[in-house]
Amino acid sequence: ITELANEYGLDVVTVPSGLQPRAALGFSFSLILIMLKRLGFVQSETVTMVENSIEPLETLVSELNRSENPALTIAEQIHNTCPIIYGSEDLTWVSAVRFRGQLAENAKMLSFHHHFPEQNHNEIEGWTMNSDIMSRFSIIWLKDEEDHPGTQARMKISSTLLESAAGCQLDISQTGENRVERLLKLIHFTDWVSYYAALLNNVDPTPVNRIQELKLRISIAV
């Protein structure tokens, strides 16, 4: 494709090779963001917000790379549980999807996610039966200071209603100058949680053996 694009004088944007897709988020996100800006779908202000988030993210890295840090603490709290990750449709549902995928690929842990207010329309009733299993679940609430007041109220009330059902409940949020910075920091923070969860599970977070085996079998079958 690159050769064909060069032949026709088209721009080519490449991501460095050798990285797992989940580890290349910084490259893929930045490239897509710039392309959308050039097409007029993203304002320059958003790009500036991303650029201004670099320094706070670097600070967060230094904090989470210590022997004792909040990401490790959360990984310890959800160890040997099945995490149920709840976010808001305002913003944090994005990081909930990412977090579920990171726990699966890095820590080899099964988890589930949903978002508010939709969770209140159906899933909350599912916490009624199988109490012996529910006690092995942990609930992780991904929150943002700009979540809709109604969503904040729903999360708070739901947390109280589910207090006796889940084994434990945890809140995760980030501070920042704007929603973009807070979202990027939240995603980065939960990435670290998945990394520490892998270490606690005594597994290497890099290989994805089941995915590779799946691809191999599909290539043979198709």
Placement of each model-derived feature along the sequence:
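A SIS-like phosphosugar-recognition module
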Residues: 1-8, 13-222
